Amino acid sequence: MSTSLFTAEEKRQVRWFVMRAYKNEKMAEDRLKDKEYGLEYFIPKHYAVRTYHGVKSKKLVPVIPSLLFVHASHSQITEFKKRYNFLQFAMWEKSTGAEYITVPDDQMDSFIKIASHYEEDTVYYRPEEIDLKRGMRVCIHGGKFDNVKGMFVRVQGKRNRRVVVLLEGVMAVSAEVHPCLLYTSPSPRDMR
């Protein structure tokens, strides 16, 4: 899920990095879209009621302020940061030292498929709020979440069991899926 020191070859490897843009999500989004860099990114968002000048309206806002994911090599991001230094790598403090937080491509693909629908029944969780031990590994076949891999678990506060995609140490997202679209995954490797 993460690496501490990169070799020259690893610096060129494209992966999903967890990044922070403190109070600059919109600027980060605009700069990452820029044709010069054109880095792939994802900011988990949801609709929330906000009041501006006494008027309530539903706005699409980041789920976790300042959190974004960038799909690029370490070298590409470092080059981007030379010009726009507001983007920071999210790090874990481990016994071996600080490590960059990265997410495997297949986990991120499943996460994006659920999170990008912006539906009201899509729910986000902190990792410690979800107990995946009682869940069953599943893959969704058909529907709008086709090929999403996650855990089918009962989530507190929800009537039906839901498919949960966990990004270890970062966040989780869940969606309600009809059980007829699910099949059990045979191997834990499918979830990595």
Where in the sequence are the language-model features?
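Single conserved hydrophobic/aromatic residue that forms the stacking wall/gate
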Residues: 183-192
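Short coil/loop residues immediately preceding or within conserved phosphate-binding loops
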Residues: 135, 147
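Acidic-enriched and Gly/Ser
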Residues: 2-134, 159, 167-181
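Short beta-strand-centered aromatic/proline hotspots
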Residues: 148-155
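Short, surface-exposed secondary-structure boundary micro-motifs
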Residues: 143-144
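A short, basic/aromatic helix-end/turn motif that makes direct DNA contacts
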Residues: 155-156, 189
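N-terminal beta-strand motif that seeds the catalytic metal site of vicinal oxygen chelate
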Residues: 163
